[in-house]
Amino acid sequence: MFMSQIVDIRAREILDSRGNPTIEADVILASGVVGRACAPSGASTGSREALELRDGDKARYLGKGVKTAVNNVNTIIRDALVGKSVFEQKDIDNTMIELDGTENKEKLGANATLAVSLAAARAAADEKKIPLFQYIADLRGQTILTMPVPMMNIINGGSHADNNVDIQEFMIEPVGFTSFSEALRAGAEIFHSLKSVLNKKGLNTAVGDEGGFAPNLRSNEEAITVILEAIGQTGYKAGSDIMLALDCASSEFYKNGQYILAGEGNKAFTSNQFSDYLAGLVNQYPIISIEDGLDESDWEGWSYLTSILGDKIQLVGDDLFVTNPKILQRGINEKVGNSILIKYNQIGTLTETLDAIYLAKDNGYSTVISHRSGETEDSTIADLAVGTAAGQIKTGSLCRSDRVAKYNQLLRIEELTKAAYRGKAEFKGLN
């Protein structure tokens, strides 16, 4: 028996940051090394995401238990993977894909396959005595490592908050800095400044699922203006040090072919009108990135949005592409969007996640590695962002340990690698 051989795999039900069950998996090697990873969980999900398997037993965790998925790991997946070398990531992942045999992993559950896939990578890195980011880099021959620009979600609306704001996330991107640690400091200072701005206006400073504030505001635009006020208070310059980013999550307010902004008196827009509305915001404010500006099924609308904004800012497909190489390829062919959000639980294995990242890179699309609104202390996405030189990471606000765990891991990686922080150079139209 060789030391890198998988001798056991164990999964358990743990809790995520919302108090809902999720899966944690351990991959155990002959050498005694144990790799551990947890699957995250989303709130606003794309309809073509790989399936997160839940038990549906209302008497237990309100139907959200994951015992079935845990059992799939402890029996079917374990039986198929024990005896394999942990260094064969592609073989491990492909075995699970074949075992499942469905397009969206509905048999085993993407939460089951992902936890095992990531735990195997962690075990492999530990067995080689190298950091996880280095192991991920070596999987695809990535020789240059970079620190990602953080996309920090500081005001929440939509399905991430119980307020009257339609756009789901208002974010800051600290682009005008020479290191990740300085960029992080700027983000934290602006976050605290925003709290005082909201306090002075008598607005709520409770935080949402991802640690951003969720005040009731008069309009979506007011969220932008309070953030600009907070940036100004800290002495940083919006438009040079700090850029803004939006995640519309517009599938959440797309009804019968129209985009309906409930927070603005149920104002209804056609696809092109909503694109023009977004273009108006871009002209008026220092916005460098818009995610899911239109519904995931509105390919024609996306085409128009890309034609008017695609050479000016980053247009990120999340619900649109769901980290799926096949769907991304369609986007590339039809010139839709210019960036992809990478959420590995949308696809269910590390190998397929890397396929999506490198397909995007090879076709000039930027990549943003992302958390989910239901997270754990697992910080794998930090290593993934550096190990693929993705360029950007989206992992929430500057509070809640489920978010900060990723930022802290990035600080450790920066200290270890001295990897470059490219800031503005990551964006079209900013260099």
Swiss-Prot record:
One Gene Ontology cellular component annotation?
Answer: cell surface
Q: Primary place of residence?
A: cytoplasm
Catalytic center residues:
E210, K343
* Catalytic reactions of this protein: (2R)-2-phosphoglycerate = phosphoenolpyruvate + H2O
Concerning Pfam families, the annotation shows: Enolase_C, Enolase_N
Q: Which SMART domains match?
A: Enolase_C, Enolase_N
The places in or outside the cell where this protein is found are: Cytoplasm; Secreted; Cell surface
- EC assignment: 4.2.1.11
Molecular-function GO term, any one: magnesium ion binding
- Residues binding Mg(2+): D247, E291, D318
Cofactor(s), names only, from the UniProt record: Mg(2+)
Provide the binding site for (2R)-2-phosphoglycerate. Answer: Q168, K343, R372, S373, K394
The pathway entry for this protein reads as: Carbohydrate degradation; glycolysis; pyruvate from D-glyceraldehyde 3-phosphate: step 4/5
CDD domains the UniProt entry points to: enolase
Keywords for the protein's UniProt record, in alphabetical order: Cytoplasm, Glycolysis, Lyase, Magnesium, Metal-binding, Secreted
Cofactor note text: Binds a second Mg(2+) ion via substrate during catalysis.
Known InterPro entries for this protein?
Enolase, Enolase-like_C_sf, Enolase-like_N, Enolase_C, Enolase_CS, Enolase_N
Any one biological process term the GO annotation gives: glycolytic process
Q: What is the role of this chain?
A: Catalyzes the reversible conversion of 2-phosphoglycerate (2-PG) into phosphoenolpyruvate (PEP). It is essential for the degradation of carbohydrates via glycolysis.
Question: Quaternary structure?
Answer: Component of the RNA degradosome, a multiprotein complex involved in RNA processing and mRNA degradation.
Tell me which family the UniProt entry assigns to this protein: Belongs to the enolase family.
Q: What is this protein called?
A: Enolase
Instruction: Tell me what gene encodes this.
Output: eno
